[in-house]
């Protein structure tokens, strides 16, 4: 592994993959910027570190979260993956829940004050302690392997393979869960306006519903993508929560603070050929927000949203995710690109089979 050269005694929590490996054992010179950025999790200022894996590398790697938040979750400050398993926090917690037999979830606070409070409180979150101990990693992997080879996972002695193939809607724990009050408020029948339909100074296009969110896409990446499109982070308002992402429900929402920026956001989506899709079956338009290699669908939400818009309990959020998956499959099958100028298919003409001529038998 490459060696670090730091300007101070404090050592950041960075995984080996981010530091990189080198056959020449060259040193990595790490630049330190006190209070150089705001943590992506707790929003508090922290000491920013940035470096290159090698002198020839053109990529600059920098820390995204503070060391306190990284230690609480046992993740790398740069890639935000588990320090030992190199997987996302959500996936790690799911695997550790299977091994331990009890649910361990890293609950993230919704408002800024609680995020700061949790960061200053210290301690460990979720299954961080399980993967922090190097000696327990092998035992964890062995237990996980035994579980995956067909041992019962729940009280009903249902094997993992059956759970994976089982539809979420048929889960006995979710059958009695009612999500209709939430579902009725989702703007799934709304359409993303085209450039001509965008009104000037209209407050009805300031809130947006966003769905098809993969669990590996963190909230801050979505927020940064919106900031990138608008060229400013002033869309976030202090009066209300600007963005809420519920990964269990595979959806969320964001609110743009003023009319000028909301109009700019609508225009930006419309002016890009690959950021609008149209459903062939019903003509509904969906905006597309591209984060990494994922496509997140956007619809204006005239009614607005709150923290409880995506389920008050984990089971409600899970059932919302299942219902949205069915919608996504249906919409993905019916979507076409904005520039798709294919002509409507003509009705195929009826093909009549030619009547076979009877061949007279000839006696020889």
UniProtKB/Swiss-Prot annotation:
Its main location: nucleus. Pfam families: STL11_N. GO terms for biological process: mRNA splicing, via spliceosome. It comes from Candida glabrata (strain ATCC 2001 / BCRC 20586 / JCM 3761 / NBRC 0622 / NRRL Y-65 / CBS 138) (Yeast). PANTHER family: PRE-MRNA-SPLICING FACTOR RBM22 (PTHR14089:SF6). Belongs to the SLT11 family. CDD domains: RRM_SLT11 (cd12265). Involved in pre-mRNA splicing. Facilitates the cooperative formation of U2/U6 helix II in association with stem II in the spliceosome. Binds to RNA. One of its GO terms (molecular function) is pre-mRNA binding. Keywords: mRNA processing, mRNA splicing, Nucleus, RNA-binding, Spliceosome. Associated with the spliceosome. Residues 346-364 have a biased composition (Basic residues). It is found in: Nucleus. This is Pre-mRNA-splicing factor SLT11. GO terms for cellular component: Prp19 complex; U2-type catalytic step 1 spliceosome; U2-type catalytic step 2 spliceosome. It comes from the Eukaryota. Residues 339-364 are annotated as: Disordered.
């Amino acid at each position: 592994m490459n060696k670090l050269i730091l300007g101070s005694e404090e050592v950041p929590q960075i995984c080996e993959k981010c530091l990189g490996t080198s056959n020449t054992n060259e040193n990595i010179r790490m630049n330190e910027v006190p209070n150089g950025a705001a943590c992506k999790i707790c929003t508090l200022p922290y000491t920013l570190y940035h470096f290159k894996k090698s002198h020839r590398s053109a990529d600059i790697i920098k820390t995204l979260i503070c060391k306190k938040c990284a230690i609480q979750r046992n993740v790398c400050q740069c890639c935000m993956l588990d320090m030992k398993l190199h997987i996302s926090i959500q996936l790690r917690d799911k695997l550790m829940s299977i091994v331990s037999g009890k649910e361990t979830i890293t609950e993230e606070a919704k408002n800024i004050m609680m995020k700061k409070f949790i960061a200053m409180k210290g301690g460990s979150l979720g299954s961080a302690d399980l993967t922090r101990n190097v000696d327990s990693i092998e035992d964890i992997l062995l237990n996980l392997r035994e579980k995956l080879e067909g041992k019962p996972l729940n009280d009903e002695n249902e094997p993992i393979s059956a759970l994976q193939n089982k539809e979420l809607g048929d889960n006995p724990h979710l059958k009695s869960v009612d999500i209709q009050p939430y579902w009725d408020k989702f703007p799934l029948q709304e359409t993303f306006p085209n450039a001509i339909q965008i009104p000037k100074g209209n407050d009805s296009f300031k809130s947006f519903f966003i769905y098809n969110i993969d669990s590996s896409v963190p909230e801050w990446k979505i927020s940064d993508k919106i900031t990138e499109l608008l060229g400013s982070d002033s869309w976030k308002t202090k009066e209300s929560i600007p963005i809420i992402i519920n990964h269990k429900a595979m959806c969320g929402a964001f609110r743009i603070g003023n009319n000028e920026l909301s109009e700019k956001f609508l225009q930006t989506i419309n002016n890009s050929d690959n950021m609008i899709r149209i459903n062939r079956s019903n003509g509904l338009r969906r905006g597309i927000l591209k984060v990494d290699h994922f496509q997140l669908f956007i619809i204006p939400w005239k009614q607005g949203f709150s923290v409880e818009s995506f389920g008050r309990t984990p089971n409600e959020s899970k059932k919302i995710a299942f219902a949205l998956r069915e919608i996504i499959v249906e919409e993905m099958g019916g979507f076409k690109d904005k520039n798709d100028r294919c002509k409507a298919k003509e009705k195929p003409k009826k093909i009549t089979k030619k009547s076979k001529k009877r061949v007279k038998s000839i006696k020889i």
